[in-house]
Regions:
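N-terminal glycine-rich phosphate-binding loop for ADP-containing cofactors
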Residues: 1-209
Length: 209
């Protein structure tokens, strides 16, 4: 299978799983981008900033195509877009190309540019908030990514709950893709790392855990 197909299949499923876990543990956009960025070896743009840069319409198109084309995928329901994403698309809040998405640039009273974040419950923008979690504080001195995963997944707070839910479901999903989309684990890792900018692919991450 083409590498872009493998990357999208796992990467988009993983992104939508992040939103699923976010709802489960009542986290917000700022918190998710803090939890899913460089601390877990993913780009600084993390989840929602990445969506704004790429364009939500692209994500919607890929997810809808995967949902339609994979009737036998046991994880298919994850490709069914959540209401929040559908509402963003209906509003044409697609990200940078339309001037607003999960984030929006605005001028404050002093004429300075500030970044506002979308509250997915009220659909109103509010000033970007600093996300803090005890689990993240404990990893500040850990440079090795695989060592960091162990600490993150053992977290006793909401961040730990989020990581366990998100990663364990991702590991289950990718293990079921062998041999369906690839005979070799490394091909899935390479496709996701290359396409989505992850430092470690899902199987390498699992190894680390």
């Amino acid at each position: 299978l083409p590498i872009s197909f493998i990357g999208n299949r796992v990467g988009v499923w993983g992104l939508l799983k992040v939103i699923d876990s976010m709802r489960k543990y009542d986290l917000n956009v700022d918190e998710i981008d803090k939890l899913t960025g460089p601390v877990i070896g993913r780009p600084k743009s993390a989840t929602f900033r990445t969506s704004d840069v790429v364009g939500l319409d692209t994500l919607v198109k890929v997810a809808n195509n995967l949902y339609a084309g994979l009737p036998n995928d046991e994880g298919r329901e994850m490709f069914k877009l959540p209401d929040t994403v559908n509402k963003l698309e209906q509003n044409k809040w697609l990200g940078d190309k339309t001037g607003q998405g999960f984030y929006k640039k605005s001028k404050n009273a002093k004429g300075e540019t500030e970044i506002l974040t979308l509250d997915l419950k009220t659909f109103e923008y509010q000033p970007k908030a600093k996300a803090k979690f005890a689990t993240l504080e404990t990893t500040k001195t850990i440079d090795n990514l695989k060592d960091r995963y162990k600490v993150l997944l053992a977290g006793k707070d909401k961040a730990g709950d989020f990581y366990r839910d998100m990663f364990f479901d991702l590991f289950k999903y990718v293990s079921n893709r062998i041999p369906e989309i690839s005979d070799e684990l490394f091909r899935i890792d390479d496709a996701v790392s290359g396409g989505f900018g992850w430092d470690l692919g899902p199987f390498e991450t699992w190894d680390g855990v």
